[in-house]
From Swiss-Prot:
This is 3-dehydroquinate dehydratase. SUPFAM superfamilies: Type II 3-dehydroquinate dehydratase. Its EC number is 4.2.1.10. Keywords: Amino-acid biosynthesis, Aromatic amino acid biosynthesis, Lyase. Coiled coil: none annotated. The gene is aroQ. Belongs to the type-II 3-dehydroquinase family. Homododecamer. It catalyses: 3-dehydroquinate = 3-dehydroshikimate + H2O. Signal peptide: none annotated.
Amino acid sequence: MKILVIQGPNLNMLGHRDPRLYGMVTLDQIHEIMQTFVKQSNLDVELEFFQTNFEGEIIDKIQESVGSDYEGIIINPGAFSHTSIAIADAIMLAGKPVIEVHLTNIQAREEFRKNSYTGAACGGVIMGFGPLGYNMALMAMVNILAEMKAFQEAQQNNPNNSINNINN
């Protein structure tokens, strides 16, 4: 299973950016932690990482995932969470599970950070757990995709389901 991890603006500055809020872990270290989790858990998962500070590039990357072999997306849109209806629209058209991650609890921050347009478009939001939130999102995504696959297989193998009856 292939999962796309999209990182938004200023996340490339983790380790330098306000350590009391974001800690000292860098973005590369977060990605290494995720890869280690995949290996230690013996998951059949391939992760692709993408970081940009540009809204349009996030939208392009989500759109490129449509019809691709990416089965799910984990996204931290950073501050675009609070401003980008365009990214929210792209998430809604992705046609696959999307989970939003935030290192901090955006509900405990400034008032303008409490609304997440992009989070409302996602299947779920994980926030406030620091770098661990990415592995939490990864665990959730693997489970969601496994459930979807099992459901699809059950539908295909059940001769009494309505789709098979329509085709007969």
